[in-house]
């Protein structure tokens, strides 16, 4: 899920332990006591975690920090990266060992991954943790959670799979594996409640980290752009397959926009060196002026902050664009066979794809999918934002309301829920409202 917790100096700030961030006077206070929660442990709590990718590593670090406020002598072990190690987690394996993507790569590494999973669960069982927390990575974590739960260890799954979008019955299987599910979005706990699974809405860490009023001027200064520049950010995805399907289409759309806005600057953040090479090849094939096309190393949030409008692939980046309050156009394509199968079997249960639209239950951003994701149609949608600042202004309060809904001091709420499980409190199944309270 995913640049959760990404910080770019001078551009974003955060909120911890109830400190106010941003300038929205209607924002709800988030009081959380840093005092340890009393418990009856004969020894300090032992907490094992697995984070299988960079975003999970950052989530895990925030959770560990908050749990340590409640249990200063707690011990933390597991699979993680630099962020989790930085807050005192002893990692038996590095998170990079789980970072495989795509069916072919997964199949190639499957024997190693199965061996690693078996070794980890035997070692963690011998360590006798009080709770195990699997962070995202459901294909790896849920079997570990189920195996440990069968042996009497309390289990938590942090970051729900998208049960609201497709295969809702997965909620039942997740409940077999996890005693508690920690959800980033408010529409998720009611789905789990229908299946008898305890799930809590804790908020989204990205909403905690991004200021209510983001600073466009600072972002433009960081990138060497003037305040008067006309700027489009283009983000065709963070994976090779996404970029291969969307990049040329997006850059052709950007060129069409530049025909109407001759001084347009185009910002293209690359998630990693492999993506950068592919994006550079696509840019070289496009008709975009070299002097006004800026290929960046990372800096996706800075690029979105600096932009007037954002063109991006459907995914977590749409949430980030909403949180920095930028109008966007969302495009996406999947392999034609995959699309036909999904449509034929009716696997998708939502009629919107972009997270801001799903959260608002409204069409805040144009969505152009599959055959509709064509340069000409993308150009029309982008120009509509550039040429109608009144529409952009009307969008801001909608974005702000969604931001406030998600901004709940997620790490602290997640730690409270884990502490409740450890202490045997709030263990009954229930529906949890958008503020994270029992309905």
UniProtKB/Swiss-Prot annotation:
Biochemical pathway: Bacterial outer membrane biogenesis; LPS lipid A biosynthesis
Annotated EC: 2.4.1.182
Keyword Transferase: yes
One Gene Ontology biological process: lipid A biosynthetic process
Cellular component GO terms held in the UniProt record: membrane
Catalytic activity of the protein: a lipid X + a UDP-2-N,3-O-bis[(3R)-3-hydroxyacyl]-alpha-D-glucosamine = a lipid A disaccharide + UDP + H(+)
Region (Disordered): 1-35
Enzyme class per UniProt: transferase
Keywords: Glycosyltransferase, Lipid A biosynthesis, Lipid biosynthesis, Lipid metabolism, Transferase
Example of a GO MF term: lipid-A-disaccharide synthase activity
SUPFAM superfamilies found in the cross-reference section: UDP-Glycosyltransferase/glycogen phosphorylase
Primary role: Condensation of UDP-2,3-diacylglucosamine and 2,3-diacylglucosamine-1-phosphate to form lipid A disaccharide, a precursor of lipid A, a phosphorylated glycolipid that anchors the lipopolysaccharide to the outer membrane of the cell.
HAMAP family: LpxB
Family from the record: Belongs to the LpxB family.
UniProt name for this protein: Lipid-A-disaccharide synthase
Gene: lpxB
């Amino acid at each position: 899920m995913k640049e959760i917790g990404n910080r770019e100096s001078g551009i974003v700030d955060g909120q911890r332990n109830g400190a106010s961030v941003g300038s929205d006077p209607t924002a709800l206070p988030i009081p959380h006591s840093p005092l340890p929660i009393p418990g009856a442990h004969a020894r300090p709590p032992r907490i094992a975690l697995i984070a299988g990718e960079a975003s999970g590593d950052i989530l895990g670090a925030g959770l560990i920090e908050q749990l340590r406020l409640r249990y200063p002598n707690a011990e933390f072990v597991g699979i993680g990266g630099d962020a989790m190690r930085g807050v005192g987690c002893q990692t038996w394996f590095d998170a990079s060992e789980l970072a495989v993507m795509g069916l072919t790569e997964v199949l190639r590494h499957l024997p190693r991954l199965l061996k690693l999973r078996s070794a980890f669960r035997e070692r963690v069982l011998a360590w006798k943790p009080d709770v195990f927390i699997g962070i995202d990575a459901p294909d790896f974590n849920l079997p570990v959670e189920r195996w440990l739960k069968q042996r009497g260890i309390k289990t938590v799954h942090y970051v729900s799979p998208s049960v609201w979008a497709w295969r809702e019955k997965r909620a039942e299987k997740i409940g077999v594996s996890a005693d508690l599910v920690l959800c980033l979005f408010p529409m998720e706990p009611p789905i789990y409640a229908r299946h008898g699974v305890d799930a809590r809405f804790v908020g989204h860490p990205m909403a905690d980290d991004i200021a209510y009023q983001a600073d466009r001027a600072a972002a433009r200064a960081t990138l060497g752009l003037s305040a008067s520049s006309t700027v489009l950010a283009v983000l065709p995805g963070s994976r090779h397959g996404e970029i291969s399907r969307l990049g040329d289409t997006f850059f052709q759309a950007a060129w069409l926009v530049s025909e109407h806005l001759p001084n347009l600057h185009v910002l293209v953040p690359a998630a990693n060196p492999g993506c950068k090479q592919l994006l550079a090849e696509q840019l070289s094939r496009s008709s975009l002026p070299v002097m006004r096309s800026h290929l960046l190393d990372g800096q996706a949030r800075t690029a979105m902050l600096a932009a007037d409008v954002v063109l991006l692939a459907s995914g977590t980046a749409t949430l980030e664009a909403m949180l920095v309050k930028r109008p966007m156009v969302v495009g996406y394509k999947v392999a034609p066979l995959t699309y036909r199968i999904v449509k034929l079997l009716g696997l998708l249960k939502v009629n919107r794809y972009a997270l801001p639209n799903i959260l608002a239950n409204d069409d805040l951003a144009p969505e152009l999918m599959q055959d509709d994701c064509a340069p000409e149609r993308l150009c029309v949608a982008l120009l509509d934002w550039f040429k109608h600042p009144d529409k952009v202004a009307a969008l801001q309060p909608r974005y702000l309301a969604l931001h406030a809904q998600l901004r709940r001091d997620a790490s602290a709420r997640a730690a409270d829920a884990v502490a409740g499980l450890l202490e045997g409190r709030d263990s009954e199944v229930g529906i949890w409202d958008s503020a994270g309270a029992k309905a």
